[in-house]
Amino acid sequence: MSQRAAPHDESERDALDPYGAATHAVFNQPTELVDFNLFSGDAALQDGVAREGTGWASNELAALGARLGSAETLELGSLANRNPPELDTHDRYGNRVDLVRYHPSYHQLMRLAVEQGLHASPWTEPRPGAHVARAARYYMQAQVEAGHGCPITMTFAATPSLAKEPDLARHWLPKIHARVYDPRNIPAAEKQGLTIGMAMTEKQGGSDVRANTTRAIALGRDAMGEAYELVGHKFFVSAPMCDAFLTLAQAPGGLTCFLAPRWRPDGTKNPIQIVRLKRKMGNVSNASSETEWRGALAWRVGPEGRGVATILEMVAATRFDCMIGSSAGMRMAAAQALDHCRQRKAFGALLIDQPAMRAVLADLALEAEASLALTLRVARALDNRAAEPREDAFARIAAPLGKYWICKRTPAHAYEAMECLGGSGAMEDSPMPRLYREAPINAIWEGSGNVQCLDVLRAISRAPQAFDAYFAEIDSARGANRALDAHVAALKDDMRDLGDFEERARDLCDRLALALQASVMVRNAPAASADAFCAARLEGRGARNWGALPKGLDLAEIVKRALPR
């Protein structure tokens, strides 16, 4: 019989196996990334907040970053997705209730977001840098969990549209703006705080909302405004427990915007009936539903026939939040990969110190930082657009470009970060699978890639000042990087004739977005990061994988800057 090798000494034996049954000691396994500060541990975010005029919020952001990075808060994000919402169409007596039940963790995250003003702060506390401060808060909160951000975004985005109707604004905006989260399933008049949803797309149209068939029948004026009855359906209604929905329907004068409450003012249920909840690959904590509108009360927002124009500001705001959310996903994915590799050894050295892995980590960090930098630059444009026409023009083209590019870069980024963790990254008790499933969502929601590219074309053709503002922004970095200068020169040459823009839309928008990111990086990021970004993205190296970087870059400095703790 073979004999088990004896321990070297008694102390080793006791430490390894005090009961005589252990098979091995656990070592070379990273600790979980928890109890870290999402603001103080993010140099790119700190620099961006200071650069874009929001240094006044730094202390508040640091306090929030510590709270959001705690093990307790991070666990809420996991719980909200492991316990998806459930629908009760009827109660046990057969009464129609259309009630969606959420896990308590979802409500805790919603409450935290509302208390931080993510749903309203630039409207209720306008000041220089208000949009940048909100973007920074949202960016950190979305790293914890993405799904609850949907109703927060829609509530935030509703204000510009509702403000156009004084009667509706007077009745609804005070509670929409309140920093009180009230999830009770009761009429709006009985609540202290309200959330607002969107209900636009239908089965036959999708993004082509002008093809909507839901009908609006005028009822006359009441205390809220011009009342209508809506009959039809909506195929994608997220956060169906919101207190009211901005929606589109065909009125006698054409496609029109309406506000439809979930409860009527008399306390009866408005017949917006939930058919079922969608089974989504990602964004699981956030209920998305199919609904039928069986004579639902709604009030007109804006003139008949101007529905798309009326709701456009809301759509623009939701698209900007897609930029924030995707940037946040990239940051958390990169942070997970970096933190794992700084602790894990293979073949005699830490992964983070091995050249091939360091190149991958640096590339992931560059993408995350450039996405955040562009997002915060657009936030500054939103802050300044009322006072500076050029900033307004810049936002018109930069927002759809950013939404298109950043959101489309996120899925591949999430996968590569997952691979850095090896097999552990594919396990469901890791945050990586959730980040991976979440990654494609923002690229699809609020207008997919081609829709964003066509919006860029419209901005260029209908508002030439937007094109001028874009290149004025790019040209402010002229002379600072040869690769960027060459890229911009070729881009300008190719855009002299826009006759075939639609056919070349993806190519041109890719290059426009890269030029914008590179310009922001060259002007603001550390030289190591800016030079590496331009060398990797603009020097025409062709198809590549993450980490296929050119020689001569300071990768160690890039990685060091991106470490979360």
Locate each region found by the language model:
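A short core secondary-structure module
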Residues: 225-271
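C-terminal helix-coil-helix/basic helical segment that borders enzyme active sites and/or dimer interfaces
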Residues: 369-403, 418-419, 492-505, 509
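C-terminal amphipathic alpha-helical interaction region
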Residues: 473-565
